[in-house]
Design a protein with these regions (language model features):
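Nucleotide and nucleotide-moiety/phosphate-recognizing core
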Residues: 2-136, 142-149, 157-176, 192-198
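An accessory alpha-helical subdomain
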Residues: 151-152, 180
Length: 199
């Protein structure tokens, strides 16, 4: 069994932005998805992309899978990725997060120990779509999916969790850009400003 894998969630319905967020072009000229792959491929031997639009992603050099349990949002995607993964520990990220920091990902991996979940927490809020999940999560997630309890925060509350606080995060990502996601056209404009400030 490989030590770690990555899972990209690309199953959102894009209700607030009129295009597939994974293929939005960044100021660098790359799409969000290509930027994400460039980061993850340097760290993980296996990358799984979970989507409900499989045909759009077959050209990429990743394992593309569809939700095992349909219509369950991010929880269904994480569950599916864990089921397909060959690794005990798996880094999960959404496809609309354009600034993921490889050093921060490595910090989560370093802290994995025997925990079910290693997750950043800033101002009392956790980041479930930039976190590390163990295959040990599968039974709890399945139970929650069966009961239609789909809130990631509630699922995480049932598991053994290591939280990474702002002080540790700030060493690698002081602006917390890793957690910035694109939901609207305004977010794209805001991203350019944030990237300029980070230079």
């Amino acid at each position: 069994m490989k030590k770690t894998s990555a899972i990209i969630l690309a199953g959102g319905k894009n209700t607030r932005i009129a295009r597939n967020k994974a293929f939005i072009q960044l100021p660098t000229g790359e799409t969000i998805l290509q930027n994400t792959l460039n980061v993850l491929q340097r760290i993980f031997p296996q990358i799984i992309l979970v989507t409900n639009q499989k045909e759009f992603y077959l050209k990429f050099n990743v394992q593309v899978v569809e939700d095992l349990i349909k219509g369950c949002g991010p929880l269904g995607g994480v569950f599916t990725g864990l089921c397909y993964s060959v690794s005990k520990h798996n880094f999960v990220v959404a496809c609309d997060m354009p600034c993921i920091n490889p050093a921060l990902i490595r910090l989560l991996l370093k802290e994995r120990g025997t925990y079910d979940v290693v997750i950043p927490e800033v101002d009392g809020e956790v980041e479930p779509l930039f976190a590390l999940y163990s295959k040990n999560c599968i039974p709890v997630m399945f139970e929650c999916l069966q009961g239609r309890n789909l809130k990631m925060s509630e699922v995480i509350g049932k598991l053994q969790v290591k939280k990474i606080g702002a002080k540790e995060i700030d060493r690698f990502d002081p602006q917390h850009l890793s957690f910035f996601n694109i939901n609207t056209e305004e977010d794209l404009k805001s991203l350019q400003i944030k990237m300029d400030q980070a230079k």
